[in-house]
Amino acid sequence: MPDNRRSQAITKGAKRAPNRAMLRAVGFGDGDFDKPIVGIANGFSTITPCNMGLDTLAKCAEHALKNAGAMPQMFGTITVSDGISMGTEGMKYSLVSREVIADSIETCVQAESMDGVIAIGGCDKNMPGALIALARLNVPSIFVYGGTIKPGHYQGRDLTIVSAFEAVGQHSAHKIDDQELLEVERHACPGAGSCGGMYTANTMSSAIEAMGMSLPHSSTMAAEDEEKRISATRSAEVLVEAIKKQILPRSLITRKSLENAVTVVMAVGGSTNAVLHLLAIAHAAEVDFHIDDFEAIRARVPVLCDLKPSGRYVATDLHRAGGIPQVMKMLLVHGLLHGDCLTISGQTIAEVLKDIPEQPRADQNVIRTWDNPVYEQGHLAILKGNLSPEGAVAKISGVKNPNITGPARVFESEETCMTAILDRKIKPGDVVVIRYEGPRGGPGMREMLSPTSALIGEGLGDSVGLITDGRFSGGTYGMVVGHVAPEAYAGGVIALVEEGDSITIDAHRRLLQLNVSETELERRRAAWQPPAPRYTRGVLAKYAKLVSTASRGAVTD
């Protein structure tokens, strides 16, 4: 079959003369209508450093597509800057943007009968939004990551955006003065690229590389380095070959490749958001994959990389140490990866990794040897109990107090909790509960980076637990539990918690328990009434009506 089998619907035959006339206006010539039309879903934006370099990559891809015999068509997708909207009402739109990105890419590609897609993204929701769309479309596709930001520097230490969030808590606790807070602010983000630790953007780019939907080594490159532009060019060339071979996303996004992605996320110490996003990608690809699969994988995979937020290094350090291919080779050698999974290049994972050393280089400390892992088991645990019968997600590795039982401090929103923290009203041993921040209740499932960072900045990160039906940033660490499901708005037990109730977070037993009798819970449940929707018009109102529970990925279809 021809490489332009889809676009023939708009380019072939006498009755398509009007269609061709429009295409001629955007640069098509007589010899171009037999070429495959490839969409470039360009997330370029000056809203955020994560995306401000994407236009350069899109132009590299556009040029390479033309040289390889394809006809590129550029179109835009939105982005939301989580770092800028964090801690505000605007953060409610962050997870919503994942769906908008997915829907917009699907809409454009289907409407214009494109033969292939290059999706280019940077900020957190760009990656899962794009992969959801590519899985739905199932036309030859590749993802190009915009790249990671380089670390900032101040007083001899590396900084990331999380340094600035934690500095707010340090400032509130009078550990640093106004000038030092300002200097951290000035130096935390030195240029283009996504947030530099193993936060959500770098986690998801690593997962996409592990699934074979992007090129090897591409997920840890610095945004401003020349190799990132070379990678964008090479991605376009590989995609044209994939169109010829009809390598489709659903032949790459399989149960085995999702297991590979989760395995890599565990090994690099990735973000809790990976659980939500990989469930959503699996749903889009119609793959049978569930929240309990994460726990099964966690139990057998060590954390091999010493990366921020809880570790010492950033993504550019990981890149210099060998990147995701080095991590994957170690996992493959020890039987924890499926080497027979196909990649966009047409090679299997095992073939891609054939020339990668089995052991990390001795002159680096980012990737540990197999017999000296950072932690012996994965860090993203699925906690269950009467507070989260559908599951909740916690980062448990490195927590100094893996078992906390304490009085509940209940807040109906992130803002009220943040005020209490900065007013020094949270004490060691407390278990903070932030509810009505779930997918429907928020709506939008905001990330709680501001309160968790403030707790750490005030020295309470090891002594205070925090649970929420909202999410956490990839920059969060400490005894925190998110994605509590069912959420409060849906009548989950988290809605029934009262101030002072005893709550247990037990990482070892993977337990999240409200220590209140079932009789008392039944009394409270009978008296509970769902709150009125916070929004009755617009995108948040639509989202709240459509979105599923977090334990299914907060999907909308």
UniProtKB/Swiss-Prot annotation:
Broad EC category: lyase
Obligatory cofactor(s): [2Fe-2S] cluster; Mg(2+)
Keyword Iron: yes
Keywords (A to Z) from UniProt: 2Fe-2S, Amino-acid biosynthesis, Branched-chain amino acid biosynthesis, Iron, Iron-sulfur, Lyase, Magnesium, Metal-binding
Keyword Heme carried by entry: no
Pathway: Amino-acid biosynthesis; L-isoleucine biosynthesis; L-isoleucine from 2-oxobutanoate: step 3/4; Amino-acid biosynthesis; L-valine biosynthesis; L-valine from pyruvate: step 3/4
Note on cofactor: Binds 1 [2Fe-2S] cluster per subunit. This cluster acts as a Lewis acid cofactor.
Gene Ontology molecular functions: 2 iron, 2 sulfur cluster binding; dihydroxy-acid dehydratase activity; magnesium ion binding
Domain of life per record: Bacteria
Pfam family, one: ILV_EDD_C
Location of the active site: S473 (proton acceptor)
Listed EC numbers: 4.2.1.9
Function: Functions in the biosynthesis of branched-chain amino acids. Catalyzes the dehydration of (2R,3R)-2,3-dihydroxy-3-methylpentanoate (2,3-dihydroxy-3-methylvalerate) into 2-oxo-3-methylpentanoate (2-oxo-3-methylvalerate) and of (2R)-2,3-dihydroxy-3-methylbutanoate (2,3-dihydroxyisovalerate) into 2-oxo-3-methylbutanoate (2-oxoisovalerate), the penultimate precursor to L-isoleucine and L-valine, respectively.
Protein's name in the database: Dihydroxy-acid dehydratase
Top-level taxonomy: Bacteria, Pseudomonadati, Pseudomonadota, Betaproteobacteria, Nitrosomonadales
